C-alpha cells in the first residue's frame, strides 16, 4: 500500500472530475476527518487517515483491501472507476440522468440507456460528459457517459443511445468474485 505518484493522481483526479467537477476537494477534506487515496495491487482505495495508521502494522502481502475501492489502473495506465465508488460520487455529481422504471433493469444488466428510457437529464449536460444514473426515485444506479448533449436528447430518435454504460449496481452480483 503506497501513496499515488503525481502522474497516477493526475489521471485518477481527471477521471473523477468528469463526474463531480470541482467537488473533488470535498472528497479529501471531509468534516468527519481527512481521507486519502492509496494504491495497492493496481487498485486505488479511498481510506481515512485514522484507519490507514492502524493498517500500517499489516504487511503488504497479507493485506487484501483497505477502505473503499475507487477503481483500478489498467495495464495501459488508464484509470477505470469501480461501482464501489458510486456512494461517494453520487452526492457530489454535477450532471445526473434519471431513467424510467422500465429501463432500470436493462441498465442494471449492463446495457446503455436509450432515449425511450430517459426520464430526466440535468440541463447543460454536454456530449461525453460523465453522468451519474439515478432511478426516478432518486436511487443511484450507476454511472456512464452522456452520448448526446441535453439539447440533442430532445430531438433524437427514441431508440438512440443517450448514455453509454460505464458501471452499475448490478455488477455487485455479476462480478462478486472480482470486486474488492
Swiss-Prot record:
Residues 93-180 are annotated as: C-terminal domain. It is found in: Nucleus, Nucleolus. One of its GO terms (cellular component) is preribosome, large subunit precursor. The keyword Transport does not apply. It comes from the Eukaryota. One of its GO terms (biological process) is ribosome assembly. The keyword Lipid biosynthesis does not apply. GO terms for molecular function: RNA binding. SMART domains: PUA (SM00359). SUPFAM superfamilies: Pre-PUA domain, PUA domain-like. Belongs to the NIP7 family. Required for proper 34S pre-rRNA processing and 60S ribosome subunit assembly. This is 60S ribosome subunit biogenesis protein NIP7 homolog. It comes from Sus scrofa. The lineage of its organism: Eukaryota, Metazoa, Chordata, Craniata, Vertebrata. The gene is NIP7.
Amino acid at each position: 500500500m503506497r501513496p499515488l505518484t503525481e502522474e497516477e493522481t493526475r489521471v485518477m483526479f481527471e477521471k473523477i472530475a468528469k463526474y463531480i467537477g470541482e467537488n473533488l476537494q470535498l472528497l479529501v477534506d471531509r468534516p468527519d476527518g481527512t481521507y486519502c487515496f492509496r494504491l495497492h495491487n493496481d487498485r486505488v482505495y479511498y481510506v481515512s487517515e485514522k484507519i490507514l495508521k492502524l493498517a500500517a502494522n499489516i504487511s503488504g502481502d497479507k493485506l487484501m483491501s483497505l477502505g473503499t475501492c475507487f477503481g483500478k489502473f489498467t495495464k495501459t495506465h488508464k484509470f477505470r472507476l469501480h461501482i464501489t465508488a458510486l456512494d461517494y460520487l453520487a452526492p457530489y455529481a454535477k450532471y445526473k440522468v434519471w431513467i424510467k422504471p422500465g429501463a432500470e433493469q436493462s441498465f442494471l444488466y449492463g446495457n446503455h440507456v436509450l432515449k425511450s428510457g430517459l426520464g430526466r437529464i440535468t440541463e447543460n449536460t454536454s456530449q461525453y460528459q460523465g453522468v451519474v444514473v439515478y432511478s426516478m426515485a432518486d436511487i443511484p444506479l450507476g454511472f456512464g457517459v452522456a452520448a448526446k448533449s441535453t439539447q440533442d436528447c430532445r430531438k433524437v430518435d427514441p431508440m438512440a443511445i443517450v448514455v453509454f454504460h460505464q458501471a452499475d449496481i448490478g455488477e455487485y452480483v455479476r462480478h462478486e468474485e472480482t470486486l474488492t
